[in-house]
From Swiss-Prot:
<keyword id="KW-1133">Transmembrane helix</keyword>
<dbReference type="InterPro" id="IPR008266">
    <property type="entry name" value="Tyr_kinase_AS"/>
</dbReference>
<keyword id="KW-0832">Ubl conjugation</keyword>
<feature type="modified residue" description="Phosphotyrosine; by autocatalysis">
    <location>
        <position position="439"/>
    </location>
</feature>
<dbReference type="InterPro" id="IPR020635">
    <property type="entry name" value="Tyr_kinase_cat_dom"/>
</dbReference>
<dbReference type="InterPro" id="IPR013783">
    <property type="entry name" value="Ig-like_fold"/>
</dbReference>
<protein>
    <recommendedName>
        <fullName>Insulin-like growth factor 1 receptor</fullName>
        <ecNumber>2.7.10.1</ecNumber>
    </recommendedName>
</protein>
<dbReference type="GO" id="GO:0043560">
    <property type="term" value="F:insulin receptor substrate binding"/>
</dbReference>
<keyword id="KW-0165">Cleavage on pair of basic residues</keyword>
<feature type="glycosylation site" description="N-linked (GlcNAc...) asparagine">
    <location>
        <position position="173"/>
    </location>
</feature>
<keyword id="KW-0418">Kinase</keyword>
<feature type="transmembrane region" description="Helical">
    <location>
        <begin position="209"/>
        <end position="232"/>
    </location>
</feature>
<feature type="topological domain" description="Cytoplasmic">
    <location>
        <begin position="233"/>
        <end position="640"/>
    </location>
</feature>
<dbReference type="Pfam" id="PF07714">
    <property type="entry name" value="PK_Tyr_Ser-Thr"/>
</dbReference>
<feature type="domain" description="Fibronectin type-III 1">
    <location>
        <begin position="5"/>
        <end position="101"/>
    </location>
</feature>
<feature type="modified residue" description="Phosphotyrosine">
    <location>
        <position position="253"/>
    </location>
</feature>
<keyword id="KW-0829">Tyrosine-protein kinase</keyword>
Length: 640
């Protein structure tokens, strides 16, 4: 329990006097190493030098006039008389503590007291002048004629106030004695000091009562008002779904059946069979099962069955059915399909298309080489990444064409089918599963800040342009096998970083073609981002043959316009990946190789006119680029 403070550099000096004389003359500057000195700032500020003494022709000596119960370090050198300084051996040292001195811990002077208001007094006493090591605390024993009480006062508290205050004393006569406690033990008790605590007058008691009574009445009334308000809120919440009012024919008998009207999507409960749990959804458990007659020309179909928790409020049950009603409007191969609803009876069920490989986030993480459950699947190639991106963009293009803004596009909300097709998942299903991906800003609802665009973070505006930004983050998740975006930043730091124009870094081993597509989606100006149809147009040549047969992009419902032919000289043309449009006014994508084809880029067939560097916008960092960087050419969008 000792600490050694290294001595400063010094020159050896000869001290011809005997050790006793040296120590007595400088006794207060001796090296002292108390076990508790590290807790006292004043002790740490004092530096104790070493003192030297020569002992001739002896193997023992006595050092006197040392401080009591104090730890010393003693160094011994063996020296040759003729060699003087150069003939000394290396030092051998020992630590030794002196014996405690009797009476050193006694408080030397008288104890005094001062009256203080509110039935309290202040005791003062002097410190022991040369205690045994270090004073640790003081103990006060005080009391009236009935019984004694004890109060402990630390050394730090004593040095701060110069004494101690005794509070909450009853009126009457008291005696008090004080004892110091050092490293070696307890000192003697002081002589008793007598003091008197006066009783409050009747007038003072009346004043205190007049002040306390109105305050107590106000607190009681305020508490009752708060209790009634909370009780009223809870009663309305349990009856009407967290305070949201819904029109009903008979409010006294309000249920989900009064709000949701069965239609052609209604499925008889006896046609549904549950087999096993798939996981927890935002409203309740999701099961795998079999449904009869929900798909044309299929007697039985494997389906996913969503349920509502038994403890769910009426509001949650209605939101559950409303989500199913939204899904009724969608009929796209790259959007998870609704197959039916069971609204009659309990629990309410929603029948969805079964996506056997789960959500895209979990699927991507299962492809990591270090995963134990990796079924010997290699990480996705560039062509597979582009295939995933095209399928997600096709589903989002369909939603955009139907005037639907997703607002929560992320890998966790995309689902993977048995044949590895990626589809836009049923909306809101994964909110509880990946709770850490969301952030509650300013007491509002949970927000997926790491996937949100700058305008959504600033103004709460969600459009198809903000969905395109989120699509770029999904591409980043695909390239990193579902790493968390903006690793190392808290949600609050991500808010500031994105709103100030910050972007995700290029993932390791990410193909240039995929990263350039991400940068297109991360233009700071929303109108400068490509549409989902433009994104599909830029990657359509890389898609598998089956994409043309099932996609919304090639369907009659979309009917994309024929691209205009460009009458340009071949020497003025170059192949640039992911060109967002076929207009002659298009600008090329940012390319770190000065206009050369990006690595792993698409084949020939996508041609644009290259703009010179001087023609590019000088303030590109305001539209998604970074400061102190080569100006970022901005792709032209048909939405401008």
């Amino acid at each position: 329990n000792a600490i050694f403070v290294p001595r400063p550099e010094r020159k050896r000096r000869e001290v011809m006097q005997i050790a006793n004389t040296t120590m007595s003359s400088r006794s207060r500057n001796t090296t002292v190493l108390d076990t508790y000195n590290i807790t006292d700032p004043e002790e740490l500020e004092t530096e104790y030098p070493f003192f030297e003494s020569r002992v001739d022709n002896k193997e023992r000596t006595v050092i006197s006039n040392l401080r009591p119960f104090t730890l010393y370090r003693i160094d011994i050198h063996s020296c040759n008389h003729e060699a003087e300084k150069l003939g000394c051996s290396a030092s051998n040292f020992v630590f030794a503590r002196t014996m405690p001195a009797e009476g050193a811990d006694d408080i030397p002077g008288p104890v005094t007291w001062e009256p203080r208001p509110e039935n309290s007094i202040f005791l003062k006493w002097p410190e022991p002048e040369n205690p045994n090591g270090l004073i640790l605390m003081y103990e006060i024993k005080y009391g009236s004629q009935v019984e004694d009480q004890r109060e402990c006062v630390s050394r730090q508290e004593y040095r701060k106030y110069g004494g101690a205050k005794l509070n909450r004393l009853n009126p009457g006569n008291y005696t008090a004695r004080i004892q110091a406690t050092s490293l070696s033990g307890n000192g003697s008790w002081t002589d008793p000091v007598f003091f008197y605590v006066q009783a409050k007058t009747t007038y003072e008691n009346f004043i205190h009562l007049m002040i306390a009574l109105p305050i107590a009445v106000l607190l009681i009334v305020g508490g009752l008002v708060i209790m009634l308000y909370v009780f009223h809120r809870k009663r309305n919440s349990s009856r009407l779904g967290n305070g949201v009012l819904y029109a009903s024919v008979n409010p006294e008998y309000f249920s989900a059946a009064d709000v949701y009207v069965p239609d052609e999507w209604e499925v008889a409960r006896e046609k549904i069979t549950m087999s096993r749990e798939l996981g927890q959804g935002s409203f309740g458990m999701v099961y795998e099962g079999v449904a009869k007659g929900v798909v044309k020309d299929e007697p039985e179909t494997r389906v996913a069955i969503k349920t509502v928790n038994e403890a769910a409020s009426m509001r949650e049950r209605i939101e559950f059915l409303n989500e199913a009603s939204v899904m009724k409007e969608f009929n796209c191969h790259h959007v998870v399909r609704l197959l039916g609803v069971v609204s009659q009876g309990q629990p309410t069920l929603v029948i969805m298309e079964l996506m056997t490989r789960g959500d895209l986030k979990s699927y991507l993480r299962s492809l990591r080489p270090e995963m134990e459950n990796n079924p010997v699947l290699a990480p996705p190639s560039l062509s597979k990444m582009i295939q995933m991106a095209g399928e997600i963009a096709d589903g989002m293009a369909y939603l955009n064409a139907n005037k639907f803004v997703h607002r929560d596009l992320a890998a966790r909300n995309c689902m993977v089918a048995e044949d590895f097709t990626v589809k836009i998942g049923d909306f809101g299903m994964t909110r509880d599963i990946y709770e850490t991906d969301y952030y509650r800003k300013g007491g509002k609802g949970l927000l997926p800040v790491r996937w949100m665009s700058p305008e959504s973070l600033k103004d709460g505006v969600f459009t198809t342009h903000s969905d395109v930004w989120s699509f770029g983050v999904v591409l980043w998740e695909i390239a990193t096998l579902a790493e968390q975006p903006y690793q190392g930043l808290s949600n609050e730091q991500v808010l500031r970083f994105v709103m100030e124009g910050g972007l995700l870094d290029k993932p390791d081993n990410c193909p240039d073609m995929l990263f350039e597509l991400m940068r297109m989606c991360w233009q700071y100006n929303p109108k400068m981002r490509p549409s989902f149809l433009e994104i599909i147009s830029s990657v359509k040549d890389e898609m598998e043959a089956g994409f043309r047969e099932v996609s919304f992009y090639y369907s009659e419902e979309n009917k994309p316009p024929e691209p205009e032919e460009l009458d340009l000289e071949p020497e003025n043309m170059e192949s640039v990946p992911l060109d967002p449009s076929a207009s002659s006014a298009s600008l090329p994508l940012p390319d770190r190789h000065s206009g050369h084809k990006a690595e792993n880029g698409p084949g020939p067939g996508v041609l644009v006119l290259r703009a010179s560097f001087d023609e590019r916008q000088p303030y590109a960092h305001m539209n998604g680029g970074r400061k102190n960087e080569r100006a970022l050419p901005l792709p032209q969008s048909s939405t401008c």
